[in-house]
Amino acid sequence: MAAAMTFCRLLNRCGEAARSLPLGARCFGVRVSPTGEKVTHTGQVYDDKDYRRIRFVGRQKEVNENFAIDLIAEQPVSEVETRVIACDGGGGALGHPKVYINLDKETKTGTCGYCGLQFRQHHR
């Protein structure tokens, strides 16, 4: 339980509502720092006196609120018939190198290391 609580704290989901969510549910998104500045997908946020804030003088910091991790989390787990699946991220110039994912165990969900898509073998 301590590990689950630590993970919840990392996601800022320690309330009762967070514990009632299914274990596979993930909640990511744009967070705001204590100074009111939006935090990027890498966790980048600067103090008021940080010299790197010079980039944002006279304009606001723009943060894309569609983080890739959120978009991947919305994708359902793909049920496949075969024991080994090949993922190339869509192929062509928009894809990634082809990787083969073993789906041997009944409860195992294989995840592509490049794009994060998840696959599960459909057992009859």
UniProtKB/Swiss-Prot annotation:
Modified-residue entries (N6-acetyllysine), positions: 98
Protein's GO biological process: mitochondrial electron transport, NADH to ubiquinone
GO terms under cellular component: mitochondrial inner membrane; respiratory chain complex I
Coiled coil spans: none
Record has Signal as a keyword: no
Presence of the UniProt keyword Repressor in the record: no
Localisation per UniProt entry: Mitochondrion inner membrane
Keywords linked to the UniProt accession: Acetylation, Electron transport, Membrane, Mitochondrion, Mitochondrion inner membrane, Respiratory chain, Transit peptide, Transport
Topology versus the membrane: Peripheral membrane protein
Feature: transit peptide: 1-28
Family: Belongs to the complex I NDUFS6 subunit family.
Biological role stated in the UniProt entry: Accessory subunit of the mitochondrial membrane respiratory chain NADH dehydrogenase (Complex I), that is believed not to be involved in catalysis. Complex I functions in the transfer of electrons from NADH to the respiratory chain. The immediate electron acceptor for the enzyme is believed to be ubiquinone.
Assembly with partners or alone: Mammalian complex I is composed of 45 different subunits. This is a component of the iron-sulfur (IP) fragment of the enzyme.
PANTHER family the UniProt entry points to: NADH DEHYDROGENASE [UBIQUINONE] IRON-SULFUR PROTEIN 6, MITOCHONDRIAL (PTHR13156:SF0), NADH-UBIQUINONE OXIDOREDUCTASE 13 KD-A SUBUNIT (PTHR13156)
Protein name: NADH dehydrogenase [ubiquinone] iron-sulfur protein 6, mitochondrial
The species this protein was found in: Gorilla gorilla gorilla (Western lowland gorilla)
